[in-house]
Amino acid sequence: MFIGSNEAQATLIQLLVERVLKELDSTPLNVAPYTVGLDSRIEELMSCLDVRSNGIRVLGLHGVGGVGKTTLAKALCNKLVGSFKCLVFMENDRENSETDDDLVYLQNKLINHISPHKPSVFEVNSGISAIKEVVHEKRVLVIMDDIHNVRQLEVLIGRRDWFSEGSRIIITTRNRDVLPDHLVNGFYEVRELAFTEALQLFSFHALRREKPTERFMNLSKQMVSLTGGLPLALEVFGSFLFERWRIEEWKDALQKLRRIRPHNLQDVLKISYDGLDVQEQQIFLDIACLFIKMEIKREDILDALKGFGFRAEIAVTILRARSLIKVFEDNSLWMHDQIRDMGRQIVLDESPVNPGKRSRLWDRDEIMTVLKAKKVRPIVRYLISSSFFSCSFSVALQVQNFSKRQI
């Protein structure tokens, strides 16, 4: 094929870019292979969005952690593939996203999704102008997952009139109060599963069947009642019991549930952590504290952990079987933020006041404070902060004894 001018070449390149982006937009997002009650909720949301109508709708999905907001948003996104010129699922991979640097990072991420040829911005106001420009060009679906504060919405979504007619914006959050009425014109509370739905989900993960056998039915019902209707708790606790066929083991697990605070998600998750061996626990804590939110591949984590003398392959397989981590089709590793928070709380409890006495540090301010003071006990194993690095994978610094080093 002969291209006769620079203008023609530029046009062809633009067409190719648009074709590639359309293919990427049509790639389904990873959703749990087994879900319960999802279809009826999607139908309710489709009615709320009314995608065939003009106008701009902003829908806020709110609910407690672990209730399935992200899963629902991803499934809805997959349902709407092909209905918009551009489809964006924005994961909030900056844990606080309150500093200008974090907000600019998220702005660039959104801009790049919609218009990859646009140059990067370097300050918030420029980002706002760039976002207004790109979202006004085409009918888009934007899903903002796990929004923590109003400021994030102000610099990423702003106002409805920024967007082209027919656009839809979906926001997920644990906190209903971060959804301002002047921006959001539809609200949907994601509620816990009904008891029959919860029993079905628990049974799948514990027994790989839709309904418990008579032998396990009574124990299963008691466990579901104590666990509550949170899909995350049901999945993790059910996976904890998978391939445990002795009634005595189930009764022991039931007693553990009875000893924790009623329907407390973190306590339920920790039962699964307590069931790991020592090395598996260490690897779980490494992943929770150091590698999550870094867009990291499974092989990279395995290489890093093997470098520290761990039999990482077996441990990662066990963590995956327990539903404590997930490995997606692109081989990226993912951990639910509630599970991550449980792991980090274990490390924080090692020394609530003095971060230098903890086994792992991940907060950049705490890292700098400890390094400046040059006071780290020998058991501090790793320091890492993804905010310090611009690359997708950062190397953990293994610490032997800072008292013997000049930092």
Per-region residue spans from a language model:
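Surface-exposed helical/coil interface segments that assemble multiprotein signaling complexes
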Residues: 161-163, 213, 240-283, 288-407
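Hydrophobic residues at beta-strand termini and immediately following loops
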Residues: 90, 188-190, 383
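Non-catalytic, charged helical/coil tracts that couple and regulate nucleotide-powered enzyme cores
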Residues: 1-10, 23-29, 110-122, 165-169, ...
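Hydrophobic residues in beta-strands of the RecA-like P-loop NTPase core, especially within AAA+ ATPase
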Residues: 142-144
